[in-house]
Amino acid sequence: MTELGPVAWPPAPIRTERLVLREPEARDRAAFIELLASPEVHTYLGGPRPRDELEREMPGAPERWPGSFVVDLDGSMIGQILLRRATEHRRPAAAGKVDLGYLFLPRAWGFGYASEACVAALDWFAAVLPGEPVVLTTQTANVGSMRLAAKLGFTEAERFQAWDAEQWLGLRSPVTPSA
């Protein structure tokens, strides 16, 4: 995965009705550790990382790189949105396209935050790199992620076996940002 391309980074914080998408900050470290160590979050992502390992290895201020947004609710991190160019993706249909990823703390599930944050990130992306398609990969067993992909307008490009499970690759064609 590499950078998005000719995008000014960081953008101004992106505000939605309930959320703010912003760059990671030092105050987010504990939430990142919680997110990466959560068995619930990583059910379909190969399992969580050991908390003690994360405590040792994670820098005081989480890494900042183009396409990495913290999802903030009332001043606290509840998740992360990732937009990264898939230069080395295993599937030809995804290679070179921007890949959408998202992780949310379990306490934030079921409130529509993922949908709200992803729509905002995709609208921002469509405004700064118009005409670019976006891909998303998830396990077909991850019902919530499959539902979110459909809600966001991703359509099936292919299914394939990887990581001992059936994977779903979706494509979202370029759209005009919503007003």
What are these model-predicted stretches?
Residues 1-107, 119-124, 128, 133, ...:
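GNAT-family acyltransferases
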Residues 76-79, 114, 144:
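Glycine-rich acetyl-CoA-binding "A-motif" of GNAT/NAT acetyltransferases
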Residues 96, 113, 141:
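Conserved acidic
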Residues 136-146:
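Conserved beta-strand-loop-alpha-helix junction that forms the acyl-donor binding cleft
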Residues 149:
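Conserved active-site tyrosine of GNAT-family acetyltransferases
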